[in-house]
Amino acid sequence: MKTGIHPNYAEITATCTCGNIIKVNSTAGKNLHLDVCGACHPFYTGTQKVVDTGGRIDKFNKRFGMLGKK
């Protein structure tokens, strides 16, 4: 490997809005601010919401359902 061509590899901190602090190695060289992390993401915490699209389907069938029936 050639010397002097590789970027500096330093430890930085990634801070989440929930207060979780993660130390990682990076070539970016500056600290990161995250919106979500593994500690507060809805998928990992089990608090994810199910999107109910039933209202949209009912609205469609109400408007166009009679066209499919003979």
Swiss-Prot record:
Part of the 50S ribosomal subunit. GO terms for biological process: translation. Belongs to the bacterial ribosomal protein bL31 family. Type A subfamily. The gene is rpmE. Keywords: Metal-binding, Ribonucleoprotein, Ribosomal protein, RNA-binding, rRNA-binding, Zinc. One of its GO terms (cellular component) is ribosome. Its cofactor is Zn(2+). Pfam families: Ribosomal_L31 (PF01197). SUPFAM superfamilies: L28p-like (SSF143800). PROSITE patterns: RIBOSOMAL_L31. It comes from Shewanella frigidimarina (strain NCIMB 400). Zn(2+) binds at C16, C18, C37, C40. Binds 1 zinc ion per subunit. InterPro entries: Ribosomal_bL28/bL31-like_sf, Ribosomal_bL31, Ribosomal_bL31_A, Ribosomal_bL31_sf. Binds the 23S rRNA. GO terms for molecular function: metal ion binding; rRNA binding; structural constituent of ribosome. This is Large ribosomal subunit protein bL31.
